[in-house]
Amino acid sequence: MKIVAKTDQGKVRKDNQDSFAAGELPGGVVWAVVCDGMGGAAGGSVASQTAVKMSDRSIKNLLTSVVENANSSIYEMSCSVESLNGMGTTVVAAMIRDRELYLVHAGDSRAYRISQEGITQLTRDHSVVQDMVEHGELTQEQAKDHPRKNIITRALGVSADIETDYYQDTLDEGDVIIICTDGLTNYVETDDIYNATRDNHYYEFADRLINLANENGGGDNITVVAMAF
C-alpha cells in the first residue's frame, strides 16, 4: 500500500478550511480522512481540524464510531463558543486492511475507485442538487452550475446526531482510491481525474489533480488523498 496526500488553498479563497490526515498502522493497514469545513473562516477551519484530530486518535476503532465522536465534539464546541455557532464539516474516512476497503462519509466530499475497468464514484453526495437530480428535477449537467450546488444536507457538527453512509468492498491489485473535497470535483471532470491517475507514479497523483483544479479556476480549497493498492 502507498499513500500520498496534499491540500491547497486554491486561487480564490483567502483561507483553507479543508483538513486531512493519513497514515499507516502495523500489519499493512492504511487510513485517511478528508474534511471540508463550513461556517465562516474561523468555524470552518476549527470544524474540519477537529474532525481530523478525533479521527486520527480513534482510527483503530470502527469508522462509524470515529465519525460519531467527531460529530459530538464539533457540535458541543459550536454550541459553547458563540463565534463558532453554525460551523460544520463534511467528512470522508477510509481504511484499507487485507484488500478490504472500509469507508464512511457525510456531505459532498467524495471517494473514487480507479481500476482497470475505469473510475467509479463510491460516495453519494449529500446535497440539495443531488436530491434534485434523483427526483428528476435536474440533470447532472444542470446540477454543476446550479446556484444551490454548495448546500449540503448532511455535515458533522450541525446536530447532536449524524447519519453517515457506509461502504465496504474488496480491492484488486493496482486499484487506487481517491478521497477529495469539492474543490477538486467542482473544477475537474471525472474522466480527467481518471486520466491523471492511470500510471504507476502514485506519488504525483495529488499534485496533478490539484494543479488541474487550479488550472481550471481554483475557486475553492482543494484536498486530495490517493491510496494505491
Task: Put a short name on every predicted segment.
Residues 1-229:
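PP2C/PPM-type serine/threonine phosphatase catalytic domain
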